[in-house]
Amino acid sequence: MAATAMRMIISIIFISTYMTHITLCQNITEEFYQSTCSAVSRGYLSALRTGWYTSVVTIELSKIQKNVCKSTDSKVKLIKQELERYNNAVIELQSLMQNEPASFSRAKRGIPELIHYTRNSTKRFYGLMGKKRKRRFLGFLLGIGSAIASGVAVSKVLHLEGEVNKIKNALLSTNKAVVSLSNGVSVLTSKVLDLKNYIDKELLPKVNNHDCRISNIETVIEFQQKNNRLLEIAREFSVNAGITTPLSTYMLTNSELLSLINDMPITNDQKKLMSSNVQIVRQQSYSIMSVVKEEVIAYVVQLPIYGVIDTPCWKLHTSPLCTTDNKEGSNICLTRTDRGWYCDNAGSVSFFPQAETCKVQSNRVFCDTMNSLTLPTDVNLCNTDIFNTKYDCKIMTSKTDISSSVITSIGAIVSCYGKTKCTASNKNRGIIKTFSNGCDYVSNKGVDTVSVGNTLYYVNKLEGKALYIKGEPIINYYDPLVFPSDEFDASIAQVNAKINQSLAFIRRSDELLHSVDVGKSTTNVVITTIIIVIVVVILMLIAVGLLFYCKTRSTPIMLGKDQLSGINNLSFSK
């Protein structure tokens, strides 16, 4: 009866948990904005890391004397081999720590080496990145160094004289104790005794004698199982230069992790959150090799503290928005560059531009504030009014209309341009939609895949509600002749300012051209006037000359009296 009741309770809990999961997923809503070719997925809750919790784990070692067992039994040989591996693991850790704390060494040298290695192994990709993107990439790698700063500080203190003995003394009668280190920091310490107890009480009494009383293979198997943790810890620290992430089950078993979470100075809601998401917690945790001495291996475990939980989070997806009515190769494109995760945080917004650094579990978003930017709440205006005057929205521009698709939480944005064929398909019905040129959106209702050219995208199958908000594509508001291209880290205001500069330059050019034309026209008028004046003067001179000539010809001839008398006499004489 009790068993039946227990099964019913478990079933009820499972059904309740399952229904809660479905309800949470159904609370996801997605808004697609046609005007900016972007989509916002809402309905998520935050789990933001705001601090670190450090603890020290110790593994007590055994003094293994040179065994005198001379048996040639196969079980004894296996035991000897396993003891040799045990000794080699301890020697490897001692060698790793012989100069200085591995964590301190890694913090000073390992991170630059990691960057150097990453540069070489990603040379092709790295060469394509712009200067600003290179700085962000390097900043992310260097962020590892700052992330482990608190753990490194504790690790360095453990090397001081007497610190390990202080921890050992505190753990004499208990497996856990809070120890105040010499730097004033109090840490929770714990010890692992399984291996030491087995070696001291079970194994060594059997092999450190002449008759080698190992009667069955179970002894060998049990030792191998218990020894495996030490071997794996040594391997992880050796391969990773003393710093490992994520936190493996060898560094901290699930029961040890849950116990440590329960001891953390956080609220019950935070403990519940971490306990129900141990895999995410492991991914965001570190283990730092510290010291091997006084028959103790000590290392620091650094766990995240999620100081901000249950505030709303949303994810912005963006895709290129291009003109489609111009000739091929003459279109212009605009893309929002503010994609990533956003979470409300104490009256402002924490923005995580590298969305992949956040881990999503159901509707919970686990992010590290070390990777965030703090923005005002006005940043939300970019979704509904990208031209708003309160917040300058971030964009990039280009003149390359490349087709692509962006998979969202419950759908897909499709940017389809040129002669590329873009379709949405159902696995049973085949192609159910063909996209025309431009930016479009499709929800996952009845859609399994999206195809853009030869690239196939699988949509997510989460439950949710999609909203299609229509609007004139903002790229159509811009003149291709003055649109600035290849602005990779710009904003609406900066792009508009460059356009205004271009327009002002064109206006100034027109004015100069007009002034030149006016000058030419004035010169022509003056020359014409002078010519006319000259012609008029010449005509006037000609007229005066003619008038004088005519006047001269029309004057009568006056004869003297003598001449007149002569004429008369001649007449009478005849």
Curated annotation (Swiss-Prot):
Intrachain S-S bonds: C37-C439, C69-C212, C313-C343, C322-C333, C358-C367, C382-C393, C416-C422
SUPFAM superfamilies in UniProt: Virus ectodomain
Family statement: Belongs to the paramyxoviruses fusion glycoprotein family.
Topological domain spans for side Cytoplasmic: 551-574
Name used for this protein in its record: Fusion glycoprotein F0
Lipoprotein as UniProt keyword: yes
Annotated gene: F
Assigned GO CC terms: host cell Golgi membrane; host cell plasma membrane; membrane; viral envelope; virion membrane
InterPro entries: Fusion_F0_Paramyxovir
A Pfam cross-reference name: Fusion_gly
Lipidation (S-palmitoyl cysteine): C550
Keyword Disulfide bond among UniProt keywords: yes
Glycosites: N27, N120, N500
Region entry Fusion peptide, spans: 137-157
Coiled-coil intervals: 76-96, 158-209, 481-516
GO biological process: entry receptor-mediated virion attachment to host cell; fusion of virus membrane with host plasma membrane; symbiont entry into host cell; symbiont-mediated induction of syncytium formation
Bilayer-crossing regions: 525-550
Signal peptide limits: 1-25
Superkingdom: Viruses
Keyword line: Cleavage on pair of basic residues, Coiled coil, Disulfide bond, Fusion of virus membrane with host cell membrane, Fusion of virus membrane with host membrane, Glycoprotein, Host cell membrane, Host Golgi apparatus, Host membrane, Host-virus interaction, Lipoprotein, Membrane, Palmitate, Signal, Syncytium formation induced by viral infection, Transmembrane, Transmembrane helix, Viral attachment to host cell, Viral attachment to host entry receptor, Viral envelope protein, Viral penetration into host cytoplasm, Virion, Virus entry into host cell
Positions in the Extracellular compartment: 26-524
Site-annotated residues for Cleavage: R109, G110, R136, F137
